Amino acid sequence: MNPFAPSAPLGGCLSPVIVALDFPTDADTLEFVARLEPSQCRLKVGKELFTASGRKLVDQLVARGFDVFLDLKYHDIPNTVASACRVAADLGVWMVDMHASGGRRMMEAAREAVANCSVRPLLIGVTVLTSMTDEELAELGLPAAAVQVERLARLAQSSGLDGVVCSAQEAAALKNLLGASFKLVTPGIRLADSAADDQRRVMTPAAAMAAGSDYLVIGRPITKAADPLATLTAINAGLAAR
């Protein structure tokens, strides 16, 4: 499998790497982003950063040529999620996600809301957060992660989403089950010499791609690096050499 195979690129990025912008302010974010290249990665804006900085920051990132994954994990009534996805599409984001546990009607409403957008973002379902253990799922009355992930991934696909967020440990089974065109977005990616931090189900970039992941969300190993672009370039080179 070619790790740089294109899939709905907006800014021409062929790397599978999505850098998680886990910064508290837009000033910190833009200072960091100035050290990156849009051809080398995409960017993820999560809840903390979006709450602090809002759509203005997303506009700035898109204007700089980056594909943006708006990681707000929508989970609400169908009409509300549909409206939010339509606004996200108007922002020009490349990808947006929602909890698959919100159900079929919610996901179908989201799909229909962006179907006629001039640039349609990829719609991704969140299955089981990579921070959660089987014991924590059991406390919620849910089955083990592998079972719940498969159940929600099937539901997301049949509801018309483009892919799901899953750990690399689940990627191979999901790729075999749901097919090559259904995109797998994998957080919990760490370099060989990195700590797991708050992610429980983690894997290295090469191992995750070999397992079937299409996109790799990488945060601290890049954002905390002395030379983020050099680290990113090394990751991409390692993946291209597979």
From Swiss-Prot:
Coiled-coil region list: none
User: What reaction gets catalysed by this protein?
Assistant: orotidine 5'-phosphate + H(+) = UMP + CO2
One cellular component term (GO) for this entry is: cytosol
Q: Specify which residues bind substrate according to the UniProt entry for this protein.
A: 22, 44, 71-80, 130, 190, 199, 219-220
Which residues are the active-site ones?
73
GO molecular function per UniProt: orotidine-5'-phosphate decarboxylase activity
Keyword line: Decarboxylase, Lyase, Pyrimidine biosynthesis
Q: What is its EC number?
A: 4.1.1.23
| Gene3D superfamilies given in the database record | Aldolase class I
What Pfam families does this protein's entry cite?
OMPdecase (PF00215)
Q: Name one GO biological process term.
A: 'de novo' pyrimidine nucleobase biosynthetic process
Keyword Lyase in record: yes
PROSITE patterns per the record? OMPDECASE
Q: Which domain of life is it from?
A: Bacteria
Indicate yes or no for the key word ATP-binding: no
Q: Write out the pathway annotation from the protein's UniProt entry.
A: Pyrimidine metabolism; UMP biosynthesis via de novo pathway; UMP from orotate: step 2/2
Q: What does this protein do?
A: Catalyzes the decarboxylation of orotidine 5'-monophosphate (OMP) to uridine 5'-monophosphate (UMP).
PANTHER family tied to this protein: OROTIDINE 5'-PHOSPHATE DECARBOXYLASE (PTHR32119:SF2)
Self-association or partners: how does it assemble?
Answer: Homodimer.
Sequence similarity: Belongs to the OMP decarboxylase family. Type 1 subfamily.
Q: What is this protein called?
A: Orotidine 5'-phosphate decarboxylase
Upper classification of the source organism reads: Bacteria, Pseudomonadati, Pseudomonadota, Betaproteobacteria, Neisseriales
Name the gene behind this protein. Answer: pyrF
